[in-house]
Every structure is written in C-alpha cells, then in structure tokens.
C-alpha cells in the first residue's frame, strides 16, 4: 500500500526544483500520485477495504487541490508535470 522510503526519495530527486526541495507542488503531486497508484493496486485485490478507499479519496482530493494551485500559478510547469506523470489524456 504505502510506497517505500527509497522509492519516495527517487521521486523527490526526480521532480525537485532544486537541491533539498521536498515541498514544492511538483514533488508533492508526484509523491501523491505514486501513493494513489499503490492504493489502486491494493484496492483492486481488496475490494472491501473501505478504510483504504477513504484514504485514497483524501489523497486524490489533496492532489487535485495542488494541481489546481499549480495550474493557476504556473501553467507551463503544470503542463510539464501532467505530461510526465501521465495524468490527463
């Protein structure tokens, strides 16, 4: 369900805007996307795990808010991020 710390560090290093960047919108969105994808795999096997489903919905809402913030403040970074993460079709 949860992503490993090593995987999380890989994502942070890939999407960080500068050295030591762990809190930018891009990094937060990328980490949330990995966690959501992990929960999708878990929920496809454990369909009755409602607690994890609620947690997934909260993560999706948080990611949606961060994406809206990024879109409103820097459309170019938003477009690059959704393209690299494959969020929109």
Curated annotation (Swiss-Prot):
It comes from the Bacteria. SUPFAM superfamilies: S15/NS1 RNA-binding domain. One of its GO terms (cellular component) is cytosolic small ribosomal subunit. One of its GO terms (molecular function) is rRNA binding. Keywords: Ribonucleoprotein, Ribosomal protein, RNA-binding, rRNA-binding. HAMAP family: Ribosomal_uS15_B (MF_01343_B). Part of the 30S ribosomal subunit. Forms a bridge to the 50S subunit in the 70S ribosome, contacting the 23S rRNA. This is Small ribosomal subunit protein uS15. It comes from Latilactobacillus sakei subsp. sakei (strain 23K).
């Amino acid at each position: 369900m949860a992503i490993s710390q090593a995987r999380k560090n890989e994502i942070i290093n890939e999407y960080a805007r500068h050295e030591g960047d762990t809190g930018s919108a891009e990094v937060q969105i990328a980490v949330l996307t990995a966690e959501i994808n992990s929960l999708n795999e878990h929920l496809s096997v454990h369909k009755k795990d409602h607690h994890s489903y609620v947690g997934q919905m909260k993560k999706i809402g948080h990611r949606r808010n961060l994406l809206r913030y990024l879109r409103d403040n820097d459309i170019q970074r938003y477009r690059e991020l959704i393209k690299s993460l494959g969020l929109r079709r």
